[in-house]
Amino acid sequence: MNRKMLQVYFICGTSDCPKGKFLDVLEKALQAGITCFQFREKGEQGLTGADKLLLAKQVQHLCHRYQVPLIINDDVELARAIDADGIHLGQEDLSVVEARQLFPGKIIGLSVGTKEEYLNSPIDLVDYIGSGPVFPTLSKDDASPAIGMDGLKQLRKLNSDIPMVAIGGLSAKDCKEVLQAGADGIAVISAISHAEDPYKATKILVDGMQAMILKFNQVESNKQILKNP
């Protein structure tokens, strides 16, 4: 998996957007340059059954048009039905071992918020981890306590190689700190889905992240030049 996929990672479902606006919000985000999309259709108002499948196919069509990977949150049957690019699992969802057996060659992401969760997870079987919540968030009813940037740094110290995306109460202003903490990108829900102008909000995120990555790469390049003149 190319870790660039995690730079601006949008997570959304119909309950995260104004009624009837979900596909419009998604397309605006795709047009503005998100690097990955996770379809997370949950909650009492979320679609189920045939309606959810139909929407997932529409989502997949849009993601394919913009050449952006589509990850399905937790729903194994849906991910298999549409042959999604991957699946994202929480700590209480299907085991990673089973998921890898069901989805050979697909992208598997895992939510990891603490050292204990990291140590108890088969990290070698996942392609990336979603770490957080960094800050308190209203987007998930069952969100764990916030870990802060320090928590993000601690998770990165446990494994310097695993691709990691930060999530939880984040916005464009956090791009620099997220990268400094060791994450490869930023995952958002409401920063885009609740924005008055989803395209503009996404563009600010994308441009901010790209500018920071460019700056970080330049700093690393200068270090190498000084080390090997």
Curated annotation (Swiss-Prot):
Q: What does this protein do?
A: Condenses 4-methyl-5-(beta-hydroxyethyl)thiazole monophosphate (THZ-P) and 2-methyl-4-amino-5-hydroxymethyl pyrimidine pyrophosphate (HMP-PP) to form thiamine monophosphate (TMP).
Enzyme class comes to transferase
Q: Name one GO cellular component term.
A: cytoplasm
Cite the cofactor comment.
Binds 1 Mg(2+) ion per subunit.
Q: What cofactor is this protein dependent on?
A: Mg(2+)
NCBIfam families named in the record: thiE
Q: Which organism is it from?
A: Streptococcus suis (strain 98HAH33)
* Residues holding 2-[(2R,5Z)-2-carboxy-4-methylthiazol-5(2H)-ylidene]ethyl phosphate: T137, L138, S139, G169, I189, S190
The reply on keyword Metal-binding is yes
Q: Which reaction does it catalyse?
A: 2-[(2R,5Z)-2-carboxy-4-methylthiazol-5(2H)-ylidene]ethyl phosphate + 4-amino-2-methyl-5-(diphosphooxymethyl)pyrimidine + 2 H(+) = thiamine phosphate + CO2 + diphosphate; 2-(2-carboxy-4-methylthiazol-5-yl)ethyl phosphate + 4-amino-2-methyl-5-(diphosphooxymethyl)pyrimidine + 2 H(+) = thiamine phosphate + CO2 + diphosphate; 4-methyl-5-(2-phosphooxyethyl)-thiazole + 4-amino-2-methyl-5-(diphosphooxymethyl)pyrimidine + H(+) = thiamine phosphate + diphosphate
Q: What is this protein called?
A: Thiamine-phosphate synthase
Where does this protein hold 4-amino-2-methyl-5-(diphosphooxymethyl)pyrimidine? Q38, F39, R40, E41, K42, N73, S111, K140
One Gene Ontology molecular-function label: magnesium ion binding
| Keywords associated with the record | Magnesium, Metal-binding, Thiamine biosynthesis, Transferase
